Swiss-Prot record:
Sequence positions that bind phosphate: G20, R24, R43, R87, V88, G89, T90
Keywords: Glycosyltransferase, Transferase
Catalysis: reaction(s): a purine D-ribonucleoside + phosphate = a purine nucleobase + alpha-D-ribose 1-phosphate; a purine 2'-deoxy-D-ribonucleoside + phosphate = a purine nucleobase + 2-deoxy-alpha-D-ribose 1-phosphate
Organismal lineage: Bacteria, Bacillati, Bacillota, Bacilli, Lactobacillales
Protein role: Catalyzes the reversible phosphorolytic breakdown of the N-glycosidic bond in the beta-(deoxy)ribonucleoside molecules, with the formation of the corresponding free purine bases and pentose-1-phosphate.
The species this protein was found in: Streptococcus pyogenes serotype M5 (strain Manfredo)
Name of the protein in question: Purine nucleoside phosphorylase DeoD-type
GO molecular function, one term: purine-nucleoside phosphorylase activity
Key word Amino-acid biosynthesis present: no
EC number of the protein: 2.4.2.1
InterPro entries from the UniProt entry: DeoD-type (IPR004402), Nucleoside_phosphorylase_CS (IPR018016), Nucleoside_phosphorylase_d (IPR000845), Nucleoside_phosphorylase_sf (IPR035994)
Subunit and partners: Homohexamer; trimer of homodimers.
Amino acid sequence: MSIHISAKKGDIADKILLPGDPLRAKFIAENFLEDAVCFNEVRNMFGYTGTYKGHRVSVMGTGMGMPSISIYARELIVDYGVKTLIRVGTAGAIDPEVHVRELVLAQAAATNSNIIRNDFPEFDFPQIADFGLLDKAYHIAREMGVTTHVGNVLSSDVFYTNMPERNMALGKLGVKAIEMEAAALYYLATQHHVKALGIMTISDNLNDPTEDTTAEERQTTFTDMMKIGLETLIAND
């Protein structure tokens, strides 16, 4: 057991999907995994291990924001030996070419958080995805016919901003979307020499507020992202 995860050694696979929403983790386990067993209910942050196409995989919620994912991802890596972590979550589009229900593969993640500057206050340490995972996910998405964008995202500490014009300026520089976790996950992966990738479904278009999705859709209908994440996890087995 770790401080925040009640699983025993061996309960968690060495490859895992990480949705922010624990109910999305439950949905993935119930709809995609065979023989899924719940390994964690602490703080209702549900985690499950089962098989997908004969391969042992896990899925666990991480909550919202970089402090939360940092807790769970670190414990998964350090205490349970997880080697491959794929975030499957939502993001808000800021690139005018990116639209609701399309996918973004986060090649790199800029951040306005101090979570990394606590270690490197003198400069901005770049947070990048594992290229092998990125490449596999991109080709799997293309084979599935899913509209997918590859590029930088902004991992933000702020959901409701008072300065939206700053976000829009980033969109003009080619930043695809804003989300709240990838930079912290990538930093932990770099620290511990494991693999990580962020796959995001666009749930909101910050350039066009008429493009949006419901809370229920965010929880249960972004199945392309879930399938691509699972297929990417098992691609090396």
